């Protein structure tokens, strides 16, 4: 189809260039394989023998694997290069699809073997993406030109298989402890989804015999599937206002490790937009860059050593945390002795942003002013980077 389309478009006057590119290749990767990883090595160790210090050898600290081989990645590319309207609009569209097998991964071993891991060829992954590049002259006159350029990239990857282990359904098994989930991207967090902070309105509040407040979660779970909430969500412990509220993702009425979900770290797409103006020797260049859908775990919100955990360390208490007089729905109440529950889930934040990466203003001196000098061309400019960033 594409061949016939290109054939019929060859005489269209406004098309300067239209080129189809197709490629396929297989490449190898040996990163992680040392010079002697496939061999059984011995470590030189010293020991006391009587009154004499002797040198000897012990089995190496890493189990060798004589069957190691390169990773293999097979990639197919389909691209179109084009130029229209006497070069005023040009660009490239490209789609790629990659399948990788025999990934170099540290396999977990039973400690009774004397080793806990071994480098091995495991698993399969697949990835695909689209790259778009577009450049055009919006205005082109003798004294003034204005050009725009944009780049767009969207990429995703997925774990197909980790090893030969199967789950109870006979399908390739995930390894949750390592963050490797079948059908999910390679780079993910595995955590709870946060629905805010518990407020007073979430509880029925009473007093016990000694006058202390007793907080009982209101019924929000429909155990009979009849459309009527008849029981509270079971958090496995006491819940009070100011604590983190997480989602019962599997709908069983209980908050357990099974409610954790993979949360993609990598952005859904990236985009850039550049603009260049030229007028009577002056030029102005502006470059914007945006990232959408990226997730990060902010250590300053959960890690005690980095200032988080809301226990008064460094800047941890400077966030908008919950108190009875400031019922924030963003951060839990602080604690003097222990981290609030589910704090790591609170720390996962949307890292999408738009940034003015570069702003440059320049002036090129006319040739007539340089006529009697050894200088053939002179341009002065000032550049600023990362001037503005817009993010949540």
Residue ranges of each PLM-predicted region?
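Outer-membrane beta-barrel and related beta-rich outer-membrane complex signature
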Residues: 11-13, 26-41, 103-107, 111, ...
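Solvent-exposed loop/turn elements at secondary-structure boundaries
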Residues: 10-72, 90, 94-125, 163, ...
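Outer-membrane beta-barrel signature, preferentially recognizing the C-terminal barrel domain
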Residues: 48-90, 118-141, 181-197, 264-269
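Residues on the lipid-exposed face of transmembrane beta-strands in outer-membrane beta-barrel proteins
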Residues: 1-3, 22, 78-82, 93, ...
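Short loop/turn motifs that connect adjacent beta-strands in outer-membrane beta-barrel proteins
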Residues: 4-18, 31, 85-88, 139-146, ...
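Transmembrane beta-strands of outer-membrane beta-barrel pores
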Residues: 24-28, 95-101, 136-138, 152-158, ...
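Extracytoplasmic gating/loop element in the C-terminal half of outer-membrane beta-barrel translocons
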Residues: 230, 238-241, 291-385
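Conserved small-residue
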Residues: 34-37, 120, 137-261, 385
């Amino acid at each position: 189809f594409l061949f016939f389309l290109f054939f019929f478009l060859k005489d269209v006057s406004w098309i300067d260039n239209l080129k189809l590119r197709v490629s396929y290749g297989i490449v190898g990767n040996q990163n992680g394989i040392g010079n002697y990883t496939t061999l059984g090595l011995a470590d030189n160790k010293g020991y006391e023998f009587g009154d004499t210090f002797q040198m000897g050898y012990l089995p190496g600290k890493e189990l060798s694997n004589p069957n190691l081989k390169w990773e293999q990645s097979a990639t197919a590319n389909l691209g179109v290069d084009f130029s229209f309207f006497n070069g005023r609009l040009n660009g490239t569209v490209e789609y790629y699809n990659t399948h990788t097998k025999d990934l170099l991964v540290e396999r977990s071993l039973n400690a009774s073997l004397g080793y806990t891991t071994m480098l091995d060829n495991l698993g399969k992954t697949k990835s695909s993406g689209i790259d778009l590049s577009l450049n055009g002259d919006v205005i082109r006159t003798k004294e003034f030109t204005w050009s725009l350029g944009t780049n767009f990239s969207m990429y995703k990857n997925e774990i197909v298989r980790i090893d030969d282990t199967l789950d109870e359904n006979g399908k390739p098994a995930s390894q949750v402890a390592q963050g490797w989930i079948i059908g999910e991207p390679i780079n993910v967090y595995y955590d709870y989804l946060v629905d805010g902070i518990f407020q007073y309105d979430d509880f029925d509040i009473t007093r016990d015999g000694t006058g202390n407040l007793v907080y009982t979660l209101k019924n929000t779970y429909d155990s009979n599937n009849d459309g009527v909430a008849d029981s509270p969500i079971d958090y496995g412990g006491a819940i009070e206002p100011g604590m983190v509220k997480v989602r019962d993702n599997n709908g069983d009425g209980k908050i357990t490790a099974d409610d954790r979900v993979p949360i993609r770290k990598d952005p859904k797409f990236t985009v850039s937009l550049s603009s260049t103006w030229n007028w009577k020797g002056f030029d102005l260049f502006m470059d914007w860059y945006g990232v959408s859908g990226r997730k990060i775990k902010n250590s300053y919100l959960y890690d005690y050593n980095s200032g988080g955990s809301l226990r008064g360390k460094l800047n941890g208490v400077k966030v908008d945390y919950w108190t009875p007089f400031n019922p924030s729905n963003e951060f839990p109440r602080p604690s003097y002795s222990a981290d609030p529950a589910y704090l790591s889930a609170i720390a996962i934040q949307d890292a999408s942003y738009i940034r003015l990466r570069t702003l440059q203003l320049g002036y090129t001196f006319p040739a007539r002013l340089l006529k009697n000098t050894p200088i053939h061309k002179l341009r002065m400019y000032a550049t600023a980077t990362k001037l503005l960033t817009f993010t949540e």
